[in-house]
């Protein structure tokens, strides 16, 4: 192994895969919706995805992936989601296990609960294996 070689970060790869699944579901089921993946390194805490639905309403979604009950949400993300909780801001967590995938949806005002309790916090919506991403997007 070269000392300058950087290892791929599996968490980001899983999050990118989650984004690809949502993007495909949008394209296949809601062609009149628009979604943009945001690069939030410049603005800490800003959610990962900005979506405009067919009515012109805006939604922001923080994407998270995990292989256990914990959710790695930063204090900046908690602050943003809590501050903007009156709007349509969401945390979408994809749990990957040996038996498949599940998606947990939490409204932004639940960010503190998700930070402290992880997936033990009661979700606003829960989708079991196999995940129907059309239903996730309609939630």
Kindly label every feature range from the protein language model.
Residues 45:
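Beta-rich catalytic cores
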Residues 66-84:
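Mg2+/Mn2+-dependent nuclease catalytic core
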Residues 84-111:
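Nucleic-acid nuclease catalytic cores
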Residues 1-40, 54, 139:
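Acidic-basic catalytic patches of nuclease active cores, encompassing PD-(D/E)XK
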Residues 54-56, 97-98:
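Short strand-connecting beta-turns/loops that link adjacent beta-strands
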Residues 111-118:
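Acidic, Ser/Thr-rich peripheral helices and adjacent loops at domain boundaries
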Residues 49-51, 57-67:
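Conserved catalytic cores of phosphodiester-cleaving nucleases, focusing on short active-site segments
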Residues 1-5, 120-139:
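Charged phosphate-binding loop/patch that engages nucleotide di/tri-phosphates or the phosphate backbone
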